Amino acid sequence: VTHRLDRPTTGVVLFARTSKALTRLNAMFQSHEQIRKTYWAIVQTPPPTPQGRLENYLWRNEKQNKSIVVKPSTKDAKHAALSYKVIAQSDRYTLLEINLETGRHHQIRCQLAAIGSPIKGDLKYGAKRSNPDGGISLHARKIEFIHPVSKLPIVITAPIPEDTLWHTLENNIPL
């Protein structure tokens, strides 16, 4: 496995077939070069602007298995950056597309909660209610990278979860 998803998250997980490919993919993920990860998230409260960039410092609380936004001077704080844009809306929910620039513990969950837009179903980060399946409405939609051996561009896209709300919002994305 070249990267991880939080347990309640759905979507793309990338596996390497050889140790050589694993070593090269791990290096790409660590350097954040030649890898682009795109997530979709459903939030009840839309962010303050239809698109933006979030840049914070996160500190991981091991005991609570949670990250929080802190001052840059905080001991063990790590820089976290992502960009987002609203891609669809319904009467009660907003679908965001998120591109990670860094890959920190619970980064998307923590940064969206910090701007008042917790992910639907994410009780740990401020959602009012859990989802019926116990998951959260965060989906690893796509990974784009350069193949470590052939050097060809690869794009892997995961279908959205089989859920009425996901399908409703996907159908609301303008063409």
Predicted regions and their residues:
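RNA pseudouridine synthases
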Residues: V1-L175
